[in-house]
Design a protein with these regions (language model features):
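Conserved active-site tyrosine of GNAT-family acetyltransferases
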Residues: 126, 131, 154
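Terminal substrate-recognition subdomain of acyl/acetyltransferases
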Residues: 79, 137, 144-158
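A short beta-loop-alpha structural element at the N-terminal edge
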Residues: 1-13
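Conserved GNAT acetyl-CoA-binding A-motif
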Residues: 102-115
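Helix-loop element at the rim of GNAT/NAT acetyltransferase active sites that forms part
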Residues: 15-31
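Acetyl-CoA-dependent GNAT
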Residues: 7, 26-84, 95-96, 101, ...
Length: 158
């Protein structure tokens, strides 16, 4: 089940987010969220959805504008699924809910700025759901081990 986050979800949301940050292969952030910074980070999003399995938060997404003004109708999102629950199609449910929420919040396009080229599971999911790759940015992502990988921006009309 996907639903809007509540303050009681913050500890698990922060833990899941930090797990992806620590892996260093998908999110651009390098610093883990603390209880305080995590609360502020999630509160400032346009929308945050969480995935629950058996009453426990196992995944989440954040949704926010990708730009301002005349480009403010384009949004951006990030997804995180607990490593113990990957491969269960939770990411797909999060993306589909995100597209619905983007429309409800008045966005017209969902754009992913920095999908790492080697993140094949995410790329195949996005393409299966109708996202279009905009090109490739050579060496656009610095992996945790220090080497650079290409990133692939994607978009989907909402």
């Amino acid at each position: 089940m996907i639903r809007a986050y509540e303050s009681k979800d913050l500890p698990l949301m922060i833990a899941i987010w930090n797990e992806v940050v620590e892996e260093g292969i998908a999110f651009p952030q390098e610093e883990a969220l603390s209880e305080e910074t995590g609360k502020a980070f999630f509160e400032e999003q346009t929308y945050c959805g969480v995935a629950e399995v058996d009453g426990k938060v196992v995944g989440l997404y954040i949704l926010h504008p990708n730009n301002v003004g005349r480009c403010g109708h384009i949004c951006n999102a990030s997804y995180a699924v607990s490593s113990s629950c990957r491969g269960l199609h939770i990411g797909e449910k999060l993306v589909l809910d995100c597209l619905e929420q983007a429309a409800k919040h008045g966005f017209r396009v969902l754009q992913f700025n920095a999908v790492v080229e080697s993140n094949l599971h995410a790329r195949h999911l996005y393409e299966r759901l109708g996202f279009v790759q905009l090109g490739t940015i050579p060496g656009g992502f610095r992996m945790k081990d220090g080497h650079y990988e290409n990133i692939c921006p994607y978009y989907h009309e909402v």
